[in-house]
Each structure stands twice: as structure tokens, then as C-alpha cells.
Amino acid sequence: MSAQVSLELHHRISQFLFHEASLLDDWKFRDWLAQLDEEIRYTMRTTVNAQTRDRRKGVQPPTTWIFNDTKDQLERRIARLETGMAWAEEPPSRTRHLISNCQISETDIPNVFAVRVNYLLYRAQKERDETFYVGTRFDKVRRLEDDNWRLLERDIVLDQAVITSHNLSVLF
């Protein structure tokens, strides 16, 4: 990462991320989509456990995409959720997106900032189904001319190597 940002800029970007999390928790998916850049890259790969000796050699086991979405694909996912016919979200999940350890730095691209946050996503559904997703997100945010923000990239890294939930229909 490059140079760290000022406290004021850190606060503004953090507030953008907190607002984005509340939109997801409140099922305001269309408002959330409006926070995304047209060029959004929204990705998550499987997590694979590597032996220490392999990591020291720089060997990483192959992974598979869980998500590798564009804005159009995210819009289709949300349209499906809005139909009320998405079985994975009947009844709808109740979520809480918690983010912490927010580290923000400049990039080589003007008005684009790299953000690393740890997250905990709690999901409750039906009476007894509960799931915790924990990991790190690597985001890039773009500052617009009107001083608003857009999410340009989100790379989601799960700590869990085995996903025990019934599905991954929630947004991170």
C-alpha cells in the first residue's frame, strides 16, 4: 500500500463504508447498487489451506471463484431477490455487517483509494439458522467530483475453508 490518507479522508471513506453496510442490512439493494461504480469488480474465491512449507516456497494451491461479478450480474442477483421467488431468501435473511480495522491508502490512480477492512457478517434466517462469515475485504473506492463515493472493487476473502451455510445469497 502507498501513503496513508489524512484523518478527515479516512473518516469520510469509513462513513461511506458504514452507510453501504447499513443499506445491505436494511435490504435497500437498489440504493446499494447506486453506490457501485459502473466498472465494479465484486469477487470472492475459495479459501484453501496450504502447508507452512508450501507457503514459505510461495506455492499457493489453486482456488475457484465463488463470485466474479460485474454490476450487471449484481443487478440480476438483486432483481431475483426482489421477486420474492428466490428460495434461498424465503424468508429473507436478517444480516449485520460489521467492519473494523479499516486501513486506507492512496493508489497510483487519482481519487481512487485502497481499503482493507476485517469484516464479520452475521446472518439469521428462519428460527434457528445462523451463520457467521469472517474475513478480510480488499476494496477500492473512487471519489467523484461532487465529493460522493463509489465502490470500484471488492475482493472478499473468507477465513473459513469450508462454508457451512446452505447458500451464499447474501451480499458482502
Swiss-Prot record:
UniProt key word NAD: yes
**Pathway(s) annotated for this protein in UniProt:** Aromatic compound metabolism; 3-phenylpropanoate degradation
Enzyme Commission number: 1.14.12.19
GO cellular component terms?
3-phenylpropionate dioxygenase complex
- UniProt key word Oxidoreductase: yes
A single MF term (Gene Ontology): 3-phenylpropionate dioxygenase activity
What keywords were assigned to this record?
Answer: Aromatic hydrocarbons catabolism, Dioxygenase, NAD, Oxidoreductase
User: What's the catalysed reaction?
Assistant: 3-phenylpropanoate + NADH + O2 + H(+) = 3-(cis-5,6-dihydroxycyclohexa-1,3-dien-1-yl)propanoate + NAD(+); (E)-cinnamate + NADH + O2 + H(+) = (2E)-3-(cis-5,6-dihydroxycyclohexa-1,3-dien-1-yl)prop-2-enoate + NAD(+)
Q: Which GO terms describe its biological process?
A: 3-phenylpropionate catabolic process
Which of the seven top EC classes does this enzyme belong to?
oxidoreductase
Subunit info?
Answer: This dioxygenase system consists of four proteins: the two subunits of the hydroxylase component (HcaE and HcaF), a ferredoxin (HcaC) and a ferredoxin reductase (HcaD).
Q: Which HAMAP family match?
A: HcaF
Q: Which PANTHER family match?
A: 3-PHENYLPROPIONATE_CINNAMIC ACID DIOXYGENASE SUBUNIT BETA, BLR3401 PROTEIN
Q: Which family does it belong to?
A: Belongs to the bacterial ring-hydroxylating dioxygenase beta subunit family.
Described by its record, this protein's role is as follows:
Part of the multicomponent 3-phenylpropionate dioxygenase. Converts 3-phenylpropionic acid (PP) and cinnamic acid (CI) into 3-phenylpropionate-dihydrodiol (PP-dihydrodiol) and cinnamic acid-dihydrodiol (CI-dihydrodiol), respectively.
Protein name, UniProt field: 3-phenylpropionate/cinnamic acid dioxygenase subunit beta
